[in-house]
């Protein structure tokens, strides 16, 4: 074992370069290499190699993009069309709640903003009765030192949608008796497919923090007291916060998934994110590592869900970007090149849903969540087919 450790740590430049290439060009190879190496030499040695690879990537990107303006990835309405949108003035129809229109917030840092930063654009969806719009997208450049750092964010109307959690076929690993008996499909249930709006990745592997999960009223892995948790009630309302704030109503929750400490909670940035070199928000990789990340957030009313996936961000930039668009509480989900993604659905030629990446450049294997079983946990959104539910009080 000692020789194996020495060999792994001594791979140096070529090993780092190989890992960098693998995680950026072959979606399955990077995770496979990392998992195989962890089994041989342990997670600490692999973490150091991963951090070296991402440091190399960051240095290359900062040199390659020096002096460049940040990119916009889609067209946005011009200033006249945008007018004085507030997110609060969309008229209602009949007796339903007002139509959903998130508030445009503009750029976080004007010196690295692209055209349209912080402007919400509607996203079409496949779900039956797909009106009114329940999903919007925007782009934020959250790091004044990196013009290439970007967060793609969607906002979902929780009055007209419901969030669901699914355990992967492998992750998170179950430690309870009931969890070990639980039958995992790694798929979106057939009964929900006509109402599908979107799906996105879940949290860390069990070995990276042992963050808990409950799904279908079955606890797979017990909760950690200081972890952040996103949780669902039977009526479809959500809770998001440190487990201590969620635990008093734990018996009412049909599912929950934990993550590292809340990046933002009740509007306040975590004290550990005062510096861009924060060392948490990634057991395998430190929070200061510049890497692809994902996060989930709720606004102060509990009526708007935010999901973000990023390129080239540290934990602080991710948290501030999510907070800027309106998230009052934010939890980081998975990180690394191969895992974060947001998928939306359209009708295929057979009429069945077909998943497509909402944002280009991320990784997604065709038919995952529908026919291809997911080894990792994930979330999906469905459009409510009943009267829109009120915002939780």
List each model region and its residues:
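Zymogen propeptides
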Residues: 2-221
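Aspartyl protease catalytic domain
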Residues: 165-324, 328
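Catalytic metal-binding/acid-base residues of hydrolase active sites
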Residues: 205, 336-338
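Active-site neighborhood of phospho(di)ester-bond hydrolases with catalytic His/Asp-centered motifs
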Residues: 330-333
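C-terminal regions of proteins
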Residues: 339-392
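Short acidic-glycine loop/turn motifs at beta-strand connectors
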Residues: 156-160, 232-237, 266, 298-302, ...
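Short, solvent-exposed loop/turn segments at the edges of secondary structure
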Residues: 149, 225, 291, 372-376
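Short beta-strand scaffold segments in enzyme catalytic cores
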Residues: 152-155, 228-232, 294-298, 340-344, ...
């Amino acid at each position: 074992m000692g020789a194996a450790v020495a060999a792994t740590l001594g791979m140096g430049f070529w090993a780092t370069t190989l890992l960098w290439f693998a995680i950026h060009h072959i979606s399955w190879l990077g995770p496979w290499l990392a998992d195989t190496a962890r089994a041989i030499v342990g997670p600490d040695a692999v973490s150091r190699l991963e951090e070296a690879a991402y440091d190399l990537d960051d240095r290359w990107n900062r040199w390659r993009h020096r002096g460049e303006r940040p990119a916009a990835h889609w067209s946005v309405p011009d200033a006249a069309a945008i007018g004085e949108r507030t997110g609060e003035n969309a008229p209602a129809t009949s007796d339903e709640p007002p139509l959903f229109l998130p508030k445009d917030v503009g750029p976080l840092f004007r010196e690295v903003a692209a055209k349209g930063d912080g402007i919400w654009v509607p996203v079409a969806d496949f779900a039956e009765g797909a009106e009114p719009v329940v999903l919007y997208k925007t782009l934020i450049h959250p790091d004044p030192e990196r013009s290439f750092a970007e967060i793609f964010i969607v906002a979902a109307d929780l009055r007209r949608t419901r969030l669901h959690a699914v355990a992967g076929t492998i992750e998170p690993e179950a430690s309870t008796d009931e969890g070990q008996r639980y039958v995992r499909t790694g798929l979106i249930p057939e009964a929900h497919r006509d109402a599908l709006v979107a799906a996105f990745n879940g949290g860390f592997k069990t070995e990276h923090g042992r963050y808990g999960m409950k799904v279908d009223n079955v606890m797979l892995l017990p909760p950690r007291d200081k972890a952040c948790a996103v949780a669902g009630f039977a009526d479809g309302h959500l809770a998001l916060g440190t487990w201590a704030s969620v635990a008093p109503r734990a018996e009412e929750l049909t599912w929950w998934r934990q993550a590292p400490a809340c990046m933002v909670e009740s509007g306040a940035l975590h004290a550990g994110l005062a510096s861009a070199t924060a060392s948490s928000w990634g057991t395998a990789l430190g929070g200061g590592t510049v890497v692809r990340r994902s996060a989930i957030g709720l606004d102060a009313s509990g009526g708007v869900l935010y999901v973000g996936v990023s390129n080239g961000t540290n934990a602080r930039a991710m948290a501030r970007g999510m907070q800027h668009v309106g998230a009052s509480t934010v939890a980081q989900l998975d990180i690394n090149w191969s895992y974060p993604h947001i998928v939306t659905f359209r009708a295929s030629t057979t009429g069945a849903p077909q998943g497509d990446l909402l944002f280009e450049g991320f990784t997604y294997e065709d038919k995952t969540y529908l026919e291809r079983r997911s080894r990792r946990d994930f979330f999906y959104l469905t459009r409510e087919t009943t009267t829109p539910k009120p915002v939780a009080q």
